[in-house]
């Protein structure tokens, strides 16, 4: 007999290396836009949740294996991923951004030809750059923060990642103050959804209903202002 969704504590997993979306406080407590959003969903949907910080590499395998119930990790909704998992309606829309030393600009991804570009293993930025096939050398990291450290040290020429992450490192990180700027934003939007295993229909319906409410009553925009400084 299946246990009702509301009767058990659901494990939510995310890779807490993407401020302001998902990251750890100095006391190692998960925080960020996605974290606040999933807690708001849980409150409205009468769900008990606990959050687990996991590495991005292998995060989908862990969901498939049943190690956790929901992914809340800035997970881009793609046709390939939808073949294996179910996604909620989007809770955030983003574009890929290229960060370079402050003052540098490029007109397209093609301008990265011959440059070394850092990113995190398996994220959309890597896929976008690979598909563009512009002749850039891609250097992948376990943590996007390491890519920005190498950018600051001159070991890579640029970093590509989701625009809220790019803006955080370019504008809000005091240790990188004045060092970085957004050199280019790719014009193909992507949408983040919470991700569950196939067949979890009751859970998916609860999540979607709560997301729709959060959008309708302005709570989503309040979270955007809190974490990104703007609701745009």
Language-model regions: role of each:
Residues 46-48, 65-73, 115-116, 134, ...:
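Alpha-to-beta junction loops
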Residues 35, 51-61, 104, 124, ...:
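Short helix-initiation/N-cap motifs at beta->coil->alpha
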Residues 16, 92-100, 163, 167-212, ...:
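Periplasmic-binding protein-like
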Residues 48, 124-141, 177-182, 209-232:
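Ligand-binding clefts/hinges and TM-proximal coupling segments of bilobed small-molecule sensing domains
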Residues 100-116:
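Flexible hinge/capping segments at coil-to-helix
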Residues 35-44, 110, 115, 121-123, ...:
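Extended ligand-binding regions for polar small-molecule ligands
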Residues 7-75, 83:
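Extracytoplasmic small-molecule ligand-binding "clamshell" domains
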Residues 58-61, 73-83, 128-131, 157-188:
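A ligand-binding cleft/hinge motif common to bilobed small-molecule-binding domains
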């Amino acid at each position: 007999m299946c246990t009702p969704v509301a009767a058990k504590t659901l494990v939510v997993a995310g890779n807490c290396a993407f401020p302001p979306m998902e990251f750890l406080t100095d006391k190692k407590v998960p925080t960020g836009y996605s974290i606040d959003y999933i807690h708001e969903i849980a409150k409205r949907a009468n769900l008990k949740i606990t959050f687990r910080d996991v590495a991005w590499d292998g995060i989908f395998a862990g969901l498939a294996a049943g190690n956790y119930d929901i992914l809340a990790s800035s997970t881009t909704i793609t046709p390939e991923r939808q073949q294996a998992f179910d996604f909620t309606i989007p809770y955030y829309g983003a574009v890929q951004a290229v960060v370079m030393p402050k003052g540098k600009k490029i007109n397209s991804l093609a301008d990265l030809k011959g440059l070394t570009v850092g990113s995190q293993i398996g994220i959309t930025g890597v896929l976008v750059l690979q598909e563009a096939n512009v002749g850039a050398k891609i250097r992948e990291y376990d943590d996007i923060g390491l890519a920005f450290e190498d950018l600051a040290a001159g070991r890579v020429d640029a970093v590509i990642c989701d625009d809220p992450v790019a803006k955080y490192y370019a504008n809000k990180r005091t240790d990188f103050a004045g060092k970085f700027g957004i050199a280019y934003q790719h014009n193909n939007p992507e949408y983040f959804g919470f991700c569950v295993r196939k067949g979890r229909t009751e859970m998916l319906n609860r999540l979607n209903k709560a997301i729709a409410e959060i959008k309708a009553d302005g709570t989503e925009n309040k979270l955007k202002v809190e974490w990104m400084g703007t609701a745009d």
